[in-house]
């Protein structure tokens, strides 16, 4: 059952994983942006970002994040998620001559604590690109001549909410604020690392396996629902979240079944009141099954 929920959240339908903007008539090659919204899964994204950096040697790598509620202790000590990820990318690229300039290709925002703030950094970067080309919303003769292919990398089950957030912010910044023209964007592509293609892959990243994977996926789905219906901060529409058709009803049934299957485990996790103890229970495991520094289960 959890695989069906995971596939929905991780955009495994090709139609969900890529958005083509057919409103651009700009010719010439596209500029590529590799975009990363920071979280505690950043370690798992390193190899995918390195691979994309090799494939697109001129691509800029935008990394946004900071220190939030679930930022890992040693990442906090390094100064925040973008600084940690930059360090890891630099380490991995050091053995590859073609990536010797990877540090200079990275652009960081280290002041965000929530996904929406992370995404606004991407919008700000696009607006600066438009400004440098002379874009002016009040001047009908002004144009932006460059187009951008944006590749978004994140842990699989987080992609649907991130996609909805990005699409909503693009609408706000192109139609309301008019910070840049929508014709600048050629496409959005959403990618998860090779080792997080299934719910089973996700389970392997957590000490308590299937129970924690179910806990996090159920929580992510309910967050997606709340953010699109106004029960929480309404950050995007049900249509952008993919909750406007019969799929939503099907996924609710899956969630209900998972809650029944993992009732005892979910009750135990939901009853944890101490934030540090909750982190210990649900944080991911990194290389060689070594638990993140500073936590002892």
Report residues per predicted region:
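A structural signal for short, hydrophobic/glycine-enriched beta-strand patches
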Residues: 1-217, 285-297
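C-terminal accessory extensions appended to soluble enzyme cores
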Residues: 202-297
């Amino acid at each position: 059952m959890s695989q069906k929920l995971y596939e929905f959240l991780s955009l495994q339908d090709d139609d969900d994983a890529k958005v083509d903007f057919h409103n651009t008539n700009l010719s010439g090659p596209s500029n590529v942006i590799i975009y990363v919204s920071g979280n505690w899964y950043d370690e798992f994204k390193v190899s995918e970002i390195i691979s994309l950096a090799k494939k697109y040697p001129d691509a800029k790598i935008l990394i946004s994040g900071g220190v939030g509620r679930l930022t890992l202790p040693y990442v906090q000590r390094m100064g925040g998620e973008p600084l940690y990820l930059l360090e890891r990318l630099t380490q991995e690229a050091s053995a590859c001559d073609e990536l010797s300039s990877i540090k200079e290709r990275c652009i960081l925002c280290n002041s965000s604590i929530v996904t929406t703030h992370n995404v606004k950094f991407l919008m700000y970067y696009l607006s600066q690109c438009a400004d440098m080309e002379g874009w002016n919303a009040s001047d009908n003769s002004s144009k932006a001549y460059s187009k951008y292919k944006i590749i978004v990398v994140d842990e699989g089950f987080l992609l649907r909410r991130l996609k909805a957030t990005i699409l909503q912010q693009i609408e706000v910044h192109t139609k309301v604020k008019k910070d840049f023209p929508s014709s600048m964007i050629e496409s959005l592509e959403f990618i998860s690392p090779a080792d997080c293609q299934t719910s089973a892959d996700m389970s392997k990243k957590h000490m308590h396996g299937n129970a924690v994977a179910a806990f996090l996926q159920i929580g992510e789905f309910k967050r997606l629902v709340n953010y699109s219906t106004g029960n929480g901060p309404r950050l995007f529409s049900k249509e952008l979240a993919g909750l406007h058709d019969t799929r939503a009803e099907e996924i609710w049934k899956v969630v209900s079944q998972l809650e029944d299957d993992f009732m005892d485990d979910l009750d135990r996790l939901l009853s944890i009141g101490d934030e540090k103890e909750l982190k210990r229970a649900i944080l991911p495991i990194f290389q060689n099954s070594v638990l993140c520094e500073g936590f002892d289960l």
